[in-house]
């Protein structure tokens, strides 16, 4: 199991950054991850787009994999939807800016 703490940075106003949100990593590879989260728009900043859906927002995250040191990643969200479980949560897919060596072999997070 892996936990992630992430913030969302506005693409329109980069000085505007959300408060940290804790989520659960569902899938993880060197190129990206999917995250289950209770909030899709922390502090009113949507994980994917600004309010007009014209400018991409950015996500900065720290991934905590049990037994390993924390790993910082940055990137953009490429998809999102409501999650099936737990009820009332969301899931999003994040593409990293740079491949992450620590996750090169992927991880079994089940």
Label the model's feature ranges.
Residues 1-110:
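Structured alpha-helical
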């Amino acid at each position: 199991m892996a936990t992630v703490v992430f913030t969302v940075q506005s693409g329109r106003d980069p000085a505007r950054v959300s408060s940290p949100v804790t989520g659960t990593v569902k899938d993880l590879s060197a190129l990206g991850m999917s995250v289950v989260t209770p909030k899709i728009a922390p502090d009113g900043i949507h994980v994917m787009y600004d309010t007009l859906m014209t400018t991409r927002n950015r996500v900065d995250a720290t991934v905590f994999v049990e037994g390993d040191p924390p790993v910082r990643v940055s990137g953009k969200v490429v998809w999102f939807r409501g999650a099936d479980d737990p009820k009332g949560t969301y899931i999003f897919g994040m593409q990293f800016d740079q491949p992450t060596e620590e996750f090169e072999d992927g991880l079994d997070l089940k």
